[in-house]
Swiss-Prot record:
The lineage of its organism: Archaea, Methanobacteriati, Methanobacteriota, Methanomada group, Methanococci. It is an enzyme of class 1 (oxidoreductase). Residues 150-178, 179-208 form the 4Fe-4S ferredoxin-type domain. This is Dihydromethanopterin reductase (acceptor). InterPro entries: 4Fe4S_Fe-S-bd, 4Fe4S_Fe_S_CS, DmrX, Flavin_trans-like, Flavoprotein, PSI_iron-sulfur_center. It catalyses: 5,6,7,8-tetrahydromethanopterin + A = 7,8-dihydromethanopterin + AH2.
């Protein structure tokens, strides 16, 4: 296989709605920007991806990766049609690589079945038509158990209903129910203000949980490996290895 490395590369980075491997994906993309001279990254973010990126407090970092210049646009699915002009660049082979990390099981299932009804799945489909190689990091790589970290949450055993967290939340993401307080993750910006003011250490960030990778999702990942010009990677750090960055 012939791969193009070097200066003036253009990459599309697709983000879907997975929290697993999200922070690692950001670390890798920032590292690519540092290590590859004049690298241009166009970032595509699905609707669910935007919500998840915000709740993990990473949204602001997107502008350090895609600053809005030509071929460095930040494309949010909620602001653009599925047939965004950016995907046309892919079908014309204007980019060197497409990277989808992390890729949800839903995204992978659509891709392997030829469904291109969203910004990200359409981009991957057009990349295949334009001979643009896609590096995809599925969160459901192999059937079994994986450990992942959650965004902000409230430990109800520690919470004393002082409501200080509600007062400092800039987006109204924390609400009081009858006898407990809850973080609405769909509105959370991941700013951490609530954790800073909580006198009872009831705000939890990065709690580890176990999740099952279903066999059907792992099977779809296997099918993904069979698609033309698609390279499936187990972890975002393997992207660095692909580009010979140590």
């Amino acid at each position: 296989m012939n791969y193009r490395f070097g200066i003036n590369m253009k990459i599309v980075w697709c983000i879907t709605g997975a929290g697993h491997l999200l922070r690692e994906s950001f670390q890798v993309m920032k590292r690519l920007k540092e290590e590859i001279e004049d690298l241009k990254v166009t970032t595509l973010v699905s609707r669910a991806g935007e919500e998840v990126v915000k709740m993990y407090g990473l949204f602001g970092e997107l502008y350090n990766i895609s600053n809005g210049n030509y071929y460095e646009e930040l494309i949010l699915e909620r602001e653009h049609p599925y047939s965004s002009p950016i995907t046309g660049r892919l079908s014309l082979g204007k980019y060197d690589y497409l990277i989808c990390s992390p890729a949800t099981g839903n995204t992978v299932a659509k891709v392997v079945n030829g469904i291109a009804d969203s910004l990200v799945t359409n981009a991957i489909a057009q990349a295949g038509k334009g001979f643009v190689k896609s590096l995809i990091v599925p969160v459901d790589y192999k059937a079994g158990i994986v450990t992942t970290k959650l965004p902000y949450a409230i430990d109800k055993k520690k919470c004393k209903l002082c409501l200080k967290c509600i007062n400092v939340c800039p987006n109204g993401a924390i609400v009081k129910r009858d006898n407990f307080v809850e973080i609405l993750l769909s509105k959370c910006l991941g700013c951490g203000n609530c954790k800073k003011v909580c006198p009872y250490n009831a705000i939890i960030e990065g709690k580890e949980i176990k999740m099952r990778v279903r066999k059907i999702d792992a099977e779809n990942t296997r099918k993904l490996m069979e698609l033309e010009d698609v390279i499936v990677l187990k972890h975002p750090y393997e992207i660095l290895e692909f580009f010979n960055i140590r």
